[in-house]
Design a protein with these regions (language model features):
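Aromatic (often tryptophan-rich) hydrophobic motifs at membrane interfaces
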Residues: 62-66, 72, 93, 106-115, ...
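A conserved beta-strand-loop-helix scaffold within acyl/acetyltransferase catalytic domains
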Residues: 7-8, 15-66, 73-83, 128-146, ...
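Short, high-confidence coil segments that cap the C-terminus of an alpha-helix
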Residues: 56-58, 118-121, 279-281
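Active-site/acyl-donor-binding loops of N-acyltransferases
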Residues: 2-12, 77, 133-157, 282-358
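A short, structural micro-pattern
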Residues: 69, 92, 118-120, 140-143, ...
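Conserved acyl-donor/pantetheine-binding loop and adjacent beta-alpha core of acyl/acetyltransferases
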Residues: 78-95
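Non-catalytic accessory segments adjacent to catalytic cores
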Residues: 103-148
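The substrate-binding groove and active-site-proximal loops of carbohydrate-active enzymes
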Residues: 95-101
Length: 358
C-alpha cells in the first residue's frame, strides 16, 4: 500500500468559487445541458455512475457570477491501495476539465488544489478544457490525441469514405457469416463484458468492474447502447457506445482472439457508424489514444486525423504523481505476466486493480 505524508488543510471557497452541495444538483444539470463545451463525461450521470460503481467520490467546483454558474469543474477523488490517491477530472474519462467561462479556469484550478489537500490527494489531473497556468501546474500537449470525423450520408458512402487499405479489411469482414445486434439488456451486457474482459486480458491490462459498465448504461439510458458482432451465435466483438449531441463515441470495445481473423472489429466499427447515423448522429468520435500507440495508428488507418489534446497535472510539493500509464516501463513485466493469466483468474482479480485506474 502506498503511504503519503499528511498534506496541510486549506480553506476552499475563494474568488467566487465554492464546492457544490446537494441543493445545486438541478442548477448543475441545467448548466451542463446548456454549455457548449460540455462533453458526455461532464454530465452528472457520469459523475454519479463512477461514484456508485467504484466508490470514487464525485465533487463539483462552481465558479459563480451574479448568482449564476459561470463555470464548473467536476472531479473524482480516486483512491487505490496500488496507485495512490488523485483528484481527477474526470474518472475513467478521456475528457474533463473546466467548462464555461474560461476566465475562471485559474480560480477553479486553485480551488481544486485546495480540495486535493483537504482530501489527502497529492495530485490533480485535468483531462481537457481551459487549463490553469499557475505555480505547480504542468501542461502536456503531446501525450494524447483525439479523433473525430463526420459520418457519411448512407451505408455505401460510409464504406467508401474509409481509406482503401482499411476498406478492404472491412469488406473481408462483411463477407464472413456474422450477425450484429444492438441493445442494452442483460444478454447484451453479459456478452459485452465477456468479450471486453478477454480483449483487455490479451492486451495485458486488468478489466474494469462489471458494475461500472452497468452503472453507465443505467445512468445514460437511451444515450448508451451495446453493439455486438456474433459468429456462429457466439459474440466475437462488442462495444459500449455513448451518444452526446450528435456524436457517437465507441468507448469500451474489443474482440476475442478469433475476431482478428474474422475482421470482426472492423465490421463492428463500420456497423456502429451506420447505426449511429440512423440514430441521427452526424459525427463519429473515436476517442483519445496515446500518441504513436497501436490504437493511434489504427484510427489513422480509418482516415481519422489526430488532434493533439492538452492535459494538466498539479502535484503537491515533495510528492510524486501517480503513474497509471500502461506504456510505462515499470509495468512492462507485469503486462507480459497478465497476458498469460487464465481468463477466470484475470476476471476475478482484474476489477480489484482496475477500479483504481480512473
Amino acid at each position: 500500500m502506498m503511504m503519503h505524508a499528511p498534506i496541510a488543510r486549506a480553506p476552499l471557497a475563494s474568488d467566487g468559487v465554492r464546492l457544490a452541495g446537494p441543493d445545486d444538483a438541478a442548477r448543475i444539470a441545467r448548466f451542463v445541458a446548456e454549455c457548449a463545451d460540455a462533453t458526455a463525461f461532464h454530465r452528472p450521470e457520469w459523475l454519479h455512475a463512477v461514484e456508485h460503481a467504484c466508490g470514487h467520490e464525485g465533487h463539483v467546483l462552481l465558479a459563480e457570477s451574479g448568482g449564476a454558474i459561470a463555470a464548473l469543474l467536476p472531479l473524482h477523488a480516486v483512491h487505490s491501495p496500488l496507485f495512490g490517491r488523485a483528484l481527477v477530472s474526470i474518472g475513467f474519462a478521456v475528457d474533463g476539465g473546466v467548462i464555461g467561462d474560461s476566465a475562471h479556469a485559474g480560480a477553479l484550478g486553485d480551488a481544486a488544489t485546495r480540495l486535493a489537500a483537504r482530501l489527502s490527494c497529492p495530485s490533480v489531473e485535468l483531462r481537457g478544457g481551459p487549463l490553469p497556468a499557475g505555480p505547480g501546474w504542468h501542461v502536456k500537449t503531446d501525450s494524447h490525441a483525439g479523433f473525430v470525423a463526420p459520418l457519411a450520408a448512407d451505408d455505401d458512402a460510409q464504406l467508401t469514405a474509409i481509406p482503401r487499405k482499411q476498406r478492404a479489411e472491412v469488406r473481408k469482414g462483411l463477407a464472413n457469416a456474422m450477425t450484429v445486434r444492438v441493445g442494452r439488456d442483460a444478454a447484451d451486457r453479459a456478452m459485452h463484458y465477456a468479450v471486453y474482459a478477454e480483449s483487455v486480458r490479451n492486451l495485458g491490462t486488468p478489466v474494469f468492474p462489471r458494475a461500472l459498465f452497468d452503472a453507465v448504461l443505467d445512468a445514460f439510458g437511451a444515450d448508451a447502447d451495446i453493439l455486438t458482432v456474433l459468429a456462429d451465435d457466439e459474440p466475437v466483438a462488442s462495444v459500449l457506445s455513448l451518444y452526446h449531441r450528435g456524436a457517437v463515441m465507441p468507448y469500451w470495445g474489443g474482440g476475442v482472439f478469433a475476431a482478428r481473423a474474422l475482421r470482426a472489429n472492423d465490421v463492428m466499427y463500420y456497423r456502429l457508424m451506420c447505426h449511429a447515423r440512423t440514430r441521427g448522429c452526424d459525427r463519429f468520435d473515436f476517442g483519445r489514444s496515446k500518441t504513436d500507440s497501436g490504437a493511434f495508428h489504427f484510427k489513422r488507418n480509418w482516415g481519422f486525423a489526430p488532434q493533439p489534446l492538452a492535459y494538466a497535472q498539479w502535484t503537491a510539493d515533495g510528492m510524486a504523481p501517480r503513474d497509471v500509464n500502461p506504456l510505462s516501463p515499470r509495468y512492462r513485466a507485469k503486462i507480459a505476466l497478465w497476458q498469460k493469466l487464465p481468463l477466470a483468474i484475470a476476471n476475478r482479480v482484474g476489477p480489484l486493480i482496475a477500479g483504481g485506474l480512473a
